[in-house]
Design a protein with these regions (language model features):
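Aromatic-rich carbohydrate-recognition surfaces in CAZymes
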Residues: 1-92, 112
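Catalytic cores of carbohydrate-active enzymes
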Residues: 90-120
Length: 120
């Protein structure tokens, strides 16, 4: 596994109503991990390196800097996107997230499209 699966675990916990964590902090972290490519760090990769190219092409080209194992990484990103989309759909329909409903639904649809699109 070369992708980031913390977002899959958090999304699964949201969908299954697992107690014990702050949903607002979780949503903010899922938003950042799903839509912001991390800056380059010295000594290795962290987070979703290659996210911008994945978003652009629907896959991570093998020549993407800091994003080795491009096929595995592409599959991992798609799985994470779909998982997070399911969590956002669920939360969008709760009173606690009523003020963010439109944002969550828009991001959920964007993630689902990204996870299921055919490469260009």
């Amino acid at each position: 596994m070369v992708g980031t699966f913390a977002d899959v675990v958090v999304a699964d916990a949201i969908v299954k109503n697992v107690p014990g964590f702050d949903l607002h902090v979780a949503v903010d972290a899922l938003m950042k991990d799903s839509f912001v490519e991390p800056p380059a760090i010295s000594g290795g990769a962290a987070g979703k390196d290659g996210l911008n190219r994945y978003t652009q092409f629907g896959y991570i080209p093998e020549d993407t800097p800091r994003a080795g194992e491009s096929v595995s990484r592409t599959l991992d990103f798609g799985f994470a996107d779909y998982s997070v989309a399911q969590a956002f759909h669920k939360l969008a329909n709760t009173p606690e997230f009523a003020s963010r409903k439109d944002e969550l639904l828009q991001k959920a649809v964007e993630l689902e499209r990204r996870a299921t699109r055919s490469p260009e």
